[in-house]
């Protein structure tokens, strides 16, 4: 309600509150020098003197989720090397699930060498950090198990029986794990620690596989690979509240990422050769932004300004600038390749991607796109996890952190 001349006290209070709000909101807006150096750019605004503080008044998040640090940047907690005390002591590693070899290759990112090979269940698809960031879950899809790995020791624990775990996510409040049961055509909400089934949500689309959550955590968008559809799911109610067919014949949507400001969702499509851009709130008709052949994985830079888009069918990575709302660069892998899923190093300087059909892993310089390493691994490497990474908690997949 706007103040009136008769309510000077209210006016004064409102102005003071507004000033405090602006000051708080501004805390998380700038990028650190390390991130700019990692990407070879200069900051558009001076870096803040103090770390971001929660702005509780503006975002009414999913009950129980940690407060949003900056309503203008959902990735505000993911700045270079800002590791949580929970993960700070973990050795830096790259965990590569080899789908056709039933193993996980463990790479030391400093030497680019494989230091361990872990035998897991049948057809491991993704390595997923748990919500509390204490465990890495290997999704053994056809083996119907999840293998826990202790990121502190690198040792695998006893597999947990979970049917059809193609991919795995966690609700922002940490209350549930969400299994993308692709062949079962289900979203299965489970206990995030024991993986006990709590609720099963049948879906009418085919091939649920990737997702991301809204800024407030109250809903998430899911891609259905084999029927070319998208779902909108109410997180708290655990209910599908929207469904649409992508406007492209033969569409095969893959990875999903929300924009830093939470206003748009991007969905990679390997058959449409680009990203669908969607307003998640309205869940209206999306538009297609071409990127390259076989568009697959989407990864955010440590300063939240760019997104790295892997084009598996042509061996390239496109760079999308959120502020300019356009593609600014394209990096081509020397000798080709099949860049698929991966993640960004904790310092933001290296993009790691699996070479799905080449039995290899690529390490790329995020400033120049230069290939730093090409490492032979097992057969069918897929959703590799770079770990640890900055953030307060994990939403799953190969590492979506808030």
Where are these regions (language model features)?
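Predominantly soluble domains enriched in secretory-pathway, periplasmic, or organellar proteins
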Residues: 27-402
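Bacterial N-terminal signal peptides that target proteins for export
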Residues: 2-15
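Bacterial N-terminal signal peptides
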Residues: 14-25
């Amino acid at each position: 309600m706007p103040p009136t001349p008769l309510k000077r006290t209210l006016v004064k209070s409102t102005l003071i509150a507004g000033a405090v709000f602006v000051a708080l909101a501004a805390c998380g807006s700038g990028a650190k020098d390390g991130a700019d150096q990692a990407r070879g750019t200069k900051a558009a605004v001076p870096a803040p003197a103090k770390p971001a503080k929660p702005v509780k008044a503006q975002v009414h998040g999913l009950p129980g989720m940690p407060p949003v640090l900056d309503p203008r940047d959902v990735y505000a907690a993911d700045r270079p090397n800002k590791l949580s005390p929970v993960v700070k002591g973990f050795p830096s590693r790259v965990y590569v699930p080899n789908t056709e070899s039933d193993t996980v290759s463990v790479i030391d990112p400093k030497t680019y060498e494989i230091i361990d090979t872990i035998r897991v269940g049948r057809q491991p698809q993704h390595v997923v950090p748990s919500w509390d960031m204490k465990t890495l879950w290997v999704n053994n899809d056809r083996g119907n198990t999840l293998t826990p790995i202790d990121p502190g020791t690198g040792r695998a624990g006893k597999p947990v029986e979970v049917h059809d775990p193609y991919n795995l996510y966690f609700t922002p409040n940490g209350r549930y794990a969400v299994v993308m049961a692709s062949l079962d055509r289900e979203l299965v909400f489970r206990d995030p620690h024991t993986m006990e089934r709590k609720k099963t949500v049948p879906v009418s689309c085919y091939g649920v596989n990737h997702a991301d959550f809204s800024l407030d955590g109250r809903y998430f968008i899911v891609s259905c690979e084999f029927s070319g559809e998208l779902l909108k799911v109410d997180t708290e109610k655990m209910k599908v509240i929207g469904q649409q067919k992508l406007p492209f014949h033969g569409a095969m949507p893959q990875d999903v990422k929300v924009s830093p400001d939470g206003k748009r969702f991007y969905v990679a499509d390997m058959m449409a050769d680009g990203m669908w851009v969607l307003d998640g709130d309205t869940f209206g008709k999306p538009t297609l932004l071409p990127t390259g052949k076989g568009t697959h994985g989407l990864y955010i830079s440590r300063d939240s300004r760019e997104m790295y888009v892997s084009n598996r069918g042509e061996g390239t990575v496109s760079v999308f600038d959120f502020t300019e709302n356009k593609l600014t660069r394209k990096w081509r892998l020397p000798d080709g390749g099949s860049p698929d899923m991966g993640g960004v190093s904790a310092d933001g300087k290296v993009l790691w991607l699996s070479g799905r059909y080449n039995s290899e892993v690529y390490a790329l310089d995020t400033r120049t796109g230069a290939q730093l390493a090409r490492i032979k691994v097992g057969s069918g490497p897929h959703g590799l996890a770079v770990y640890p990474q900055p953030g307060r908690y994990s939403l799953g997949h190969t590492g979506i952190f808030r």
